[in-house]
A protein has these predicted regions:
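Extracellular Ig-like/FN3 beta-sandwich strand-entry sites
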Residues: 367-369
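Conserved PDZ fold ligand-binding element
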Residues: 121-122, 324-355
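A structural signal for beta-strand boundary/capping segments at domain termini and interdomain linkers
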Residues: 143, 380-382
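Serine-dependent protease modules
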Residues: 10-12, 20-33, 37-309, 317-318, ...
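N-terminal intrinsically disordered, acidic low-complexity segments at the extreme N-terminus
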Residues: 2-14
Length: 391
């Protein structure tokens, strides 16, 4: 049977493929080009390294020029002061329970500084507290066994002595803390974490700070607060001013972590100048006293009962300086307790409690005359008292 070709041409071919989309082909081409460029960019350093020569070009050193004036001053200060600072290591003698042998156990490290040509070294009391022996290392590497001359736990100051026969290190120059200003530059040299002769810088952040004493002892007053980095091992080292003079002994930090947090404290040099000569001379610090007895708890009760301020004198020692000046203590009569003299201030500085009174007296020396503002039975007067040696 013949095929009608015209009839077949009237219907489309169901298997005919659609014509390619030129837009899709163009997009695929662009995508491939972008991917190739990205790969080339990624491996470009490797390609450059492969084809470039293996020899590295030498770099020229850029001239630095002169150091800044403050840099020169800091460098000069450290170079002059370094030899006056020492590294202290302590050890404790321990007896073995079974063998009864005695051996030395390392205890801690700290810093100190040369006080005079006689070989006296000043440091913190807590650096050598509980130690059986101490070794002092000089900046030139020499080591010496140190002997304890004296200590004042109330001021956290101790004096050691070493026997340097030749090439004695220079004593650190001494300044004053009476005219310090907040904002002054300060420099701390010490051995933080055993890193010997480390220099840190900062400023005086505040003055006349107080810290509680060890084991409930009297507070340490008139401390210098600084933001110079002070860490464990800096204790006992010098705090210097921009002239390289001693203005304090680095003694404590305030830090939750135990490391420097920008709040450090130093015992002022004026306190050091008052305490150290006594330690060298007598081995202990003798506090100046009035010759009276006071008690903080009883004083607070009396102040609450009378609604007053100051420090009540509980008892006057017969023959004491206070007795000669006419001060009187509390009397117990059949009618009750009769308050005696109440000290309002010392040399014009208020004494709000017993601790403040003792701090005011501690600023002076035995033999100094202080002016007390006292009140008894509602009448005020001023009394001059020559300070005597305390107990």
């Amino acid at each position: 049977m013949p095929i009608n070709r015209r009839l077949l041409m009237a219907y489309p071919d169901p298997y005919q493929r659609p014509a390619p989309d030129h837009f899709v082909r163009r997009w695929l081409f662009i995508t491939a080009c972008i991917a190739a460029l990205m790969l080339l960019w990624q491996f470009l350093p490797a390609i450059e390294a492969w084809f470039s020569p293996r020899e590295a070009a030498e770099r020229t050193v850029t001239a630095r020029g002169d150091l800044a004036a403050d840099e020169k001053a800091t460098i000069e200060l450290f170079e002059k002061s370094r030899a006056s600072v020492v590294y202290i290591t302590t050890a404790q003698l321990v007896r073995d329970v079974w063998t009864r042998n005695v051996f030395s156990v390392p205890r801690g490290t700290g810093s100190g500084f040369i006080w005079d040509d006689a070989g006296h070294v000043v440091t913190n009391f807590h650096v050598i507290q509980g130690a059986s022996e101490a070794t002092v290392k000089l900046a030139d590497g020499r080591d010496y066994q140190a002997a304890l001359v004296g200590a004042s736990p109330a001021h956290d100051i101790a004096v050691l002595k070493i026997g340097v026969g030749f090439k004695r290190p220079p004593a650190v120059p001494v300044g004053t803390s009476a005219d310090l200003k907040v904002g002054q530059k300060v420099f701390a040299i010490g051995n933080p974490f055993g890193l010997d002769w480390t220099l840190t810088t900062g400023i005086v952040s505040a003055l006349d700070r107080s810290l509680p004493g060890e084991a409930g002892g009297p507070a340490i007053d008139h401390l210098i607060q600084t933001d110079a980095a002070i860490n464990p091992g800096n204790s006992g080292g010098p705090l210097l001013d921009s002239a390289g003079r001693l203005i304090g002994i680095n003694t404590a930090i305030y830090s939750p972590s135990g490391a420097s947090a920008g709040i450090g404290f130093a015992v002022p040099v004026d306190t050091v100048m008052r305490v150290v000569p006594q330690l060298i001379k007598t081995g202990k610090y003798i506090r100046p006293a009035l010759g009276i007895e006071v008690d903080e708890q009883l004083n607070q009760r009396l102040l609450a009962l009378t609604g007053s301020k100051g420090v009540f004198v509980l008892r006057v020692t017969p023959g004491s300086a206070a007795h000669k000046a006419g001060l009187a203590g509390v009397e117990v009569t059949p009618q009750g307790i009769v308050p005696g003299d109440r000290i309002i201030d010392v040399d014009g500085k208020a004494t709000d409690d017993v601790a403040k009174l003792l701090a005011r007296l501690d600023d002076r020396k035995v033999g100094d005359v202080v002016v007390l503002s006292v009140e008894r039975a509602g009448k005020s007067r001023e009394v001059r008292v020559e300070l005597q040696p305390g107990i």
